[in-house]
């Protein structure tokens, strides 16, 4: 069993699974939690949206950008699901506190993160695939002709993590809650090894 309190994160701070423990039970105050965690089908959907998009970019079929198209890649692998990443992501999602947690690395590697939430009054929750598409759509603001890190990462940083070539694994956590008649789906995806290292390449261009 991993002692998360002993993990030293690249960015410092106390590990999420030490600070909150490893229980994924929601801690959401006045929000009425309708569901937490992901079904097998939802996990597969998240993986499929990521890998379809990674292959689309790798093949040079992504025409969007500022300017587009995005150049093809020669080292883009498919991501695989990692339960440890998912559990740590779920501990954080279950705090219902929208934002990034500081320390979520594993013994194996530093960990990156994408977050999204969507709220609707339509008494239903958006699918996780819809939330992942929000990250994908940031490609429209991405300029491939300058160094990737010179882009505005507030606008494009989820996209760059999604297609970061050296990332191999993903695990996500989710909470669906209701507050004041708003139905909110909050999704946290953790990636290992982390992307968005300024001195490394997004991917090898073909």
Swiss-Prot record:
It is found in: Secreted. Residues 47-191 form the SCP domain. It holds the Pfam family CAP. Disulfide bonds join 5-18, 9-103, 28-96, 172-189. PROSITE patterns: CRISP_1 (PS01009), CRISP_2 (PS01010). CDD domains: CAP_euk (cd05380). This is Venom allergen 5. It comes from Vespula vidua.
